């Protein structure tokens, strides 16, 4: 059984989005997305996968296919397959989002 202390996957770099893979299997992928103040991530989409986003720390504005929702810590939302996603930090505090995607996206190539 795999287990993780999510605190080990939290890291911030000024002006950067820091993403760290927590788990990856054939059917599921989980990562943290860390945004400093005024940070944003996206737009991104995956035609074949749904995603569950949970705020672990901070406050975010999620724009999913041009629909806007503001959520605080412990808030969660679903991003349907093929939907475009943008995440924006909505507070002066750092933002940490746990993103769980199924099925996992194709491997990134350089």
Annotate the PLM regions:
Residues 1-29, 42-43, 77, 108-110:
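A short, N-terminal "cap"/entry segment at the start of jelly-roll beta-barrel domains
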Residues 31-46:
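Conserved short histidine dyad/triad with adjacent acidic residue
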Residues 40, 47-49, 63-65:
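Compact, glycine-rich, soluble single-domain proteins
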Residues 45-47, 90-91:
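Short glycine/proline-enriched turns and hinge-like loops at secondary-structure junctions
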Residues 48-60:
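Glycine- and acidic-residue-biased ligand/ion/polar-headgroup-sensing regions
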Residues 59-61, 68, 84, 94:
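Structural motif
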Residues 66-81:
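Short acidic-glycine-tyrosine-enriched beta hairpin
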Residues 81-106:
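Ligand-binding loop in jelly-roll beta-barrel domains
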């Amino acid at each position: 059984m795999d287990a993780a202390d999510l605190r080990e996957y939290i890291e911030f770099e000024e002006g950067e989005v820091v993403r760290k893979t927590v788990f990856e299997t054939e059917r599921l992928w989980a990562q943290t997305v860390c945004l400093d103040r005024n940070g944003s991530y996206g737009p991104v989409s995956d035609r074949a996968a749904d995603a569950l986003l949970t705020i672990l720390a901070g406050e975010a504005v999620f724009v999913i296919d041009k629909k806007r929702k503001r959520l605080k810590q412990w808030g969660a939302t679903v991003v349907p397959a093929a939907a475009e996603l943008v995440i924006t930090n909505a507070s002066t505090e750092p933002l940490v989002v746990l993103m769980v995607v199924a099925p996992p996206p194709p491997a990134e190539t350089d």
